[in-house]
Amino acid sequence: MRTTFDCIVVGGGHAGCEASMALARLGQKVLLITGNVDRIGHLSCNPAVGGIAKGHIVREIDALGGMMGLWADKAGIQFRTLNRSKGPAVRATRAQVDRDLYMQAVKQDIFSQPNLSVWQDTVEAIIVKDGHTGGVKTALGQLFNSQYVILTTGTFLSGLMHIGQKNFSGGRLGDVGTSKLSSSLHSIGLHLGRLKTGTTPRLLKTSIDFTSMEMQLGDTPIPSFSFHGPKPSQPQVPCYITWTNEYTHDVIRSGMDRSPMFTGVITGTGARYCPSIEDKVARFADRDRHQIFVEPEGLTSQECYINGISTSLPLDIQLALIATIPGLENAHMVRPGYAIEYDYVDPMQLHPTLETKVLPGLWLAGQINGTSGYEEAAGQGLWAALNVFCKITRQEPFILGRDNAYLAVLVDDLVTQGTKEPYRMFTSRAEYRLLLREANADIRLTPLGRKIGLVGDYQWNLFQKKISDIDTLVNRLQNIRIKPDTLDPSIFLELGESIPNRAYTLEELLKRPSITFQTLRKIYSDLPITSEDVYLETETIIKYAGYLDRQEELVQRSAKLEHSYLPKEIDYTKVAGLSSEVIEKLQIVRPQTLGQAGRISGVTPAAITCLEIYLKKIHAFR
């Protein structure tokens, strides 16, 4: 049995699967250690991938050559484009996925991937050799050697589950966790905190009355995540919408005295943007109802996921509250909802590569860094893997700017500001979100994935054709002029647009708010035939040209700070004009650039000016 590897990945969740696949595909010998091989790629909470900002991350993973988009497209049973009526910056893809099909897709790739070995075991300690990572020790007494370890432990670090006043240890309902690894990380010098998340009851599909609910269908044509993979081919199924009511809320209030959240049993901080139903009822007392989505767990599954009633209330209260909800009056509970507390590492102890500052060779990715969500985890797994690969091959680190990717915003927020609650990505977190559209993730990132070696020939050729098609289409639109006497006035009147009184290029016409490519085809039938993606991206480039230019200008203005690097061993006590509070925060984060320093909470513009003056002095001295 092989015991030495180029990299060891601990944890078979979304971060671990993405990390191990990337490194193995890049030619590295990888060992993936997970506590339960049957649960590799398991969707622990809701059976869905994507959503606002999260869909952006999935597409960025795909653009770089990662896997999540391919797996979601294979297993998707309902696809929707969210915010379709809003601007291109916030439009996002979300897929309801078949839980079993998703795991099958992941495991098929994991077990067939050359260079990738899988071992079922529990990692209990990080081996340290001469101040560097040396490998891991497992519960079965195995010692695996590697200079590079990526920890992707999810909720399994000292996990403690709660249902009412009952609690039991584990990483997930039905799976054991680990407390010894927490102790090992603490002994290394990492500071751990405590977070909390939760999940909803699962109900028997045949016991639900769907006729009293609102049906929600997916989109046609079906959107997808991957720029280069097969289009979704699974049968598409509906979700359903229902609501809580005052009776539901009365039942919930009656159980608050036995809620682990409201009696102080749970000490970990929960997700602000994914509150439990008891938290929603307490915080929004003026609301007489809350929306619930009834989501299928899969095409052949007999369970439904009840999205919107995550809870850790006692079992009798869970049963009673479900019986008050329209359509669920006679529903049979298959699995209860529960909360889980777990350890995480303060991410300000990480470099922007996600390598720990205290122990070279140890990387962290996913919920261990304080994030929530499959997509955020998968993105960190890929980010960590690419940086491990760069370190092994002695290349420059793989670090992107906040104007390049949501992945960069995510990592920069974590390592610069840290988090005291589960971090979730939103489009509002990105200051350059119009540049970071879901639709142009390939344009932003595929050349980088190709350069590092993760984007294959097929994906690269498709990308190059797309770029060529966009260039050709833009050129045609700029050079084709339409005279007013050749136009059908009714086309413009129907849209509420003024009738052109002079010759216009097709580009000028497309800039009008109500005119789309569908309209242009009526005006000029000889447009190049290409994919819908090319039409949409071209339309965005032309319609939003002014806004895009303005964001590019903002990027250029901040570029000076982003490229002003701070010395690694800088002593901030020697920088004149800095307050003790600012010095303390700079010493903790150790920012790499002035731009990153400026994003640290409490570091003022005046402090940045002091740092600029200091840099000028030391550069002049040299």
UniProtKB/Swiss-Prot annotation:
Signal peptide location: none
Principal place of residence: cytoplasm
SUPFAM superfamilies on file: FAD/NAD(P)-binding domain
Cofactor list: FAD
Family annotation (InterPro entries): FAD/NAD-bd_sf (IPR036188), GIDA_C_N (IPR049312), MnmG (IPR004416), MnmG-rel (IPR002218), MnmG-rel_CS (IPR020595), MnmG_C (IPR026904), MnmG_C_subdom (IPR047001), MnmG_C_subdom_sf (IPR044920)
Subcellular location: Cytoplasm
Record's keyword terms, sorted: Cytoplasm, FAD, Flavoprotein, NAD, tRNA processing
Chain positions recorded as FAD binding sites: 11-16, 123, 178, 367
Entry annotated with the keyword NAD: yes
Gene Ontology MF term list: flavin adenine dinucleotide binding
PANTHER family, alphabetized: GLUCOSE INHIBITED DIVISION PROTEIN A, PROTEIN MTO1 HOMOLOG, MITOCHONDRIAL
Subunit structure: Homodimer. Heterotetramer of two MnmE and two MnmG subunits.
Protein name per Swiss-Prot or TrEMBL: tRNA uridine 5-carboxymethylaminomethyl modification enzyme MnmG
Organism expressing this protein natively: Lawsonia intracellularis (strain PHE/MN1-00)
Lineage: Bacteria, Pseudomonadati, Thermodesulfobacteriota, Desulfovibrionia, Desulfovibrionales
